[in-house]
């Protein structure tokens, strides 16, 4: 099978010059936020599906790249609904992970807590001109 050279639809390669610009901008953001007392944090790109899904469904539900259960947890022949197959997903923004992070670590964080997070997010919606399925976000 021949190697497919182009990235998956909605994704893009970042060449060195663009990476230089991105790193410059990210460093400026870190420096500026640091001046105002913000601390850098990092959260996993994979979150529990319950945290990513809203109870009402809606638009956010359509954004989630869902990850199938693995190993013994995945029982295809017994699955009756999506919840039987999926237990996690890729974050579609940084706000949901920040909420989980704060909830989990509040006792160890200063008050007030000022957080800066920059990282990739993924959205499963159909890509359009100038919009990608994977992109960098700052929260």
Predicted regions and their residues:
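TRNA-recognition modules of translation machinery and tRNA-sensing kinases, especially anticodon-binding
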Residues: 1-139
């Amino acid at each position: 099978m021949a190697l497919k050279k182009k990235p998956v639809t909605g994704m893009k390669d970042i060449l060195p010059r663009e990476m230089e610009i991105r790193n410059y901008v990210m460093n400026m953001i870190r420096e500026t936020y640091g001046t105002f007392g913000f601390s850098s944090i990092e959260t996993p790109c994979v979150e529990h599906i319950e945290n990513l899904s809203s109870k009402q469904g809606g638009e956010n539900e359509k954004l989630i790249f869902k990850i199938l259960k693995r190993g013994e947890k995945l029982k295809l022949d017994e699955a009756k609904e999506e919840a039987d197959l999926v237990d996690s997903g890729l974050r579609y923004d940084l706000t949901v992970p920040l909420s989980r992070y704060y909830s989990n670590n509040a006792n160890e964080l200063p008050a007030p807590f000022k957080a800066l997070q920059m990282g990739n997010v993924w959205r499963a919606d159909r890509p359009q001109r100038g919009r990608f399925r994977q992109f960098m976000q700052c929260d």
